[in-house]
């Protein structure tokens, strides 16, 4: 189930994004980006709809994923 990011408390959203960035360990090319930059990248993806916050009932957990990879029912 998609959780609208706008309905998440700002501090909680910050923590979710930061945990996601730290867990992903994505390679950003030749120039390493700071944690702050990576967090802002994910925040931008949420704002423009490229990424979504998802609740998994099965795992009882929240995750951030590309909208294109989400195949659940809203």
Curated annotation (Swiss-Prot):
Pfam families, alphabetized: UPF0270
Record InterPro entries: UPF0270, YehU-like_sf
SUPFAM superfamilies: YehU-like
Family the entry assigns: Belongs to the UPF0270 family.
Protein's name in the database: UPF0270 protein NT01EI_3666
Annotated source species: Edwardsiella ictaluri (strain 93-146)
Upper taxonomic lineage: Bacteria, Pseudomonadati, Pseudomonadota, Gammaproteobacteria, Enterobacterales
